[in-house]
Each structure stands twice: as C-alpha cells, then as structure tokens.
Amino acid sequence: FEIYNKDMLSSDKKYTLNNIPAAYAVMLQNMETITRVYYGDLYTDNGHYMETKSPYYDTIVNLMKSRIKYVSGGQAQRSYWLPTDGKMDNSDVELYRTNEVYTSVRYGKDIMTADDTEGSKYSRTSGQVTLVANNPKLTLDQSAKLNVEMGKIHANQKYRALIVGTADGIKNFTSDADAIAAGYVKETDSNGVLTFGANDIKGYETFDMSGFVAVWVPVGASDDQDIRVAPSTEAKK
C-alpha cells in the first residue's frame, strides 16, 4: 500500500491513474446519469475502513455536494481548439501539441436550451460549466478566447470557480465568498456568454491533474439550495 499511496501523490504516476478529479468533474455533471463513486478514489485501501482520505477526497466531495445545488437542465458539450503561444507546437509528443479544450454546460433548473428564458425559482442560481484539457504543457496565446454559452437566462450574471487547476494542484471553493476573495469570479455578457482567456486555462502537471480542469457555477445560490427532482417511474417522452 505504501508504494501505491505514494504514487497517488506523485505527478509522474506509475501505478495509479491520472486525472481522477477531472473524470469525476465530467461524470458528475452529465445529464441522465448516476455516477458510481469508487471507494479507492475517496480513501486509501490500507488501515481501517474510511480511515485515511485520498488526495482527491476534497475535490470529489465538493463535486458531489455541488451536484445537489447546481447540476440541472439541458446539457451542451463541445470541444474548442484554441490558438497557442507557439512554445508547445514543436514537441515530439503528440499529446503535448494538442490545444483541445472540452466544455460541458448544464443550463440550470428547468432550462433545456441556451435560448430558454422562462425558468423557475432556481433557474438562475443553478447550472454550471466544466472545462477539461489533457495537455499538461498547454499554453494559450494571449489572444485566445473561449466563449461558452451558459444560456440567455444567465445574462449579466456573476459566476465563480468551484474547482480550478493551478500550478499547486486543484483549488476547491465551497462558498461564493471564498472564490470571489481569491479572484475567481467572472460575469456573463448580455447573451449569457462566459469568456475564458489564456490566463484562465493552462496545462499543469500535479499530483491531481495532468492538463487542466475547472468547474464554474453561478453566484447567489443559497447554502441549502437543492435542485434534485423527485423519483418517477413514468417513461420519458
């Protein structure tokens, strides 16, 4: 167990998998799926049951709790190929040359498309966007702009980071105040478009991330916001 646990804390993994948090960030946001969370991703296998938390514990738990508050509505997934600063273009490793950034948007409670503007109580304070890149050497040109449609119902609305990749690993924020105080806050335009630039998206090689991952959510949700729906046996039309 010692070798395995040490490998989880390494950025150069030999026995464990890279990007466990990013995988959960994608799965826990997906529409009409129920994600099975693996015990070994939350806790180490040595010692007593649930005795020692894994290095991914905080991020996975943050994502699971945020699912209750934010993950609802229609979904749009898209990949973008953004201009780079040229430093990574001559690498012999194909992965290190890729400039792909994957995005997945959930529009919010009772909002099924980006054009919907008639929602309900929690429509504006729910929804989220997940950003993932697999290139740890990704460096974008300063002109690069990633424009993500959060939905027109989210026009002129502030968003803040829930998780965000940094050179020191993934940072977690469990409140609006903490994320805003750290400077991780943005505002959509009049069409509900949220824009990310070269300073927002960058590849890193850390124990919990090989590439980049971030999740952004609307500012203003109450601590007890719950957008889950009641179970039903009715067939979906």
Regions found by a protein language model. Name each.
Residues Y38-T44, Q75-E100:
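Acidic carboxylate-rich catalytic motifs and surrounding loops in phosphoryl-/glycosyl-chemistry enzymes
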Residues N5-L17, T52-I60, Q142-N147, G169-N199:
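Short, polar loop/linker segments at the starts of domains and inter-domain junctions
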Residues F1-D45, T59-K69, G108, K121-Y122, ...:
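Conserved alpha/beta catalytic core and glycan-binding cleft of carbohydrate-active enzymes
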Residues N135-K137, T166-A167, G220-D223:
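Acidic glycine-/aspartate-rich tracts in secreted/extracellular proteins
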Residues E149-D168:
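Solvent-exposed beta-hairpin/edge-strand motifs
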Residues N90-K152:
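Carbohydrate-binding surface patches
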Residues N46-M50, T139-D141:
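Extracytoplasmic/secreted cell-surface and envelope-processing proteins
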Residues F173-K237:
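C-terminal beta-strand-rich structural cap/linker in extracellular carbohydrate-active enzymes
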